[in-house]
């Protein structure tokens, strides 16, 4: 067998560690068919959310008003994530939380005293961005979505404790909790996966749009960025708003990347895994589990949330 003379090899053809990493990363983030469908649905969510936020007169058109009511309910939920993030960091910094209020027109407000303001103020946007990114990543896998829904239920309990005097918070959280239970039964949990994905996209979009609207496009003196700028004194509110916007976009992208890298299972494999992890009672008989179709599940979510929005 002839020997190989390693000296004749051109070092330029030997891949460098950085090139190997980029090649491996590109392979891991390349979506399979199931992930590609998930990305398409997420893209549709983004387009619908963006259009309805900029065309409020669509309320007068009956079919689109259903979707708009859906959007309002989901937006209130993401506002709840924002306020809950304020409260959570407030508790960690020894603040006293008095109440959390949600309002469909004004957004939300967290009443507290004490704590560290330069931590509690940015926690709203950064916390809801992180939650949105985590939900987007979980939206690529059925079992991960089940875990995410349980974590959301814990968030709901804390929010209800601090917002126990706000009836809108009770209606919203009880309604969303009912939808989580309902979607758990649809398609072996596939509808729950798209519901979690929708809430994740909505949470990230809320942060991006709210920062742009309150800080960059127009200056609101009562915004988190304005209060943070007043406390720090080193930069104007628009600078902090821009920084938070960049961080929110990074979280959004990381949520998608983590989902693509971590959850490569196809639809059939996810269905099998889901049947062994917190399975739906009676799902094996097919009595309670509907056909696991991507777009049917997405439409089920849209219709159900629209009904909730009309209540």
PLM segments and residue spans:
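Hydrophobic transmembrane alpha-helical segments that form the core helix bundle
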Residues: 123-222
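C-terminal GPI-anchoring signal of eukaryotic secretory precursors
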Residues: 232, 279-298
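Individual transmembrane alpha-helix segments
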Residues: 30, 106-129, 133-134
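Small-residue-rich helix-interface/hinge motifs
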Residues: 56-118
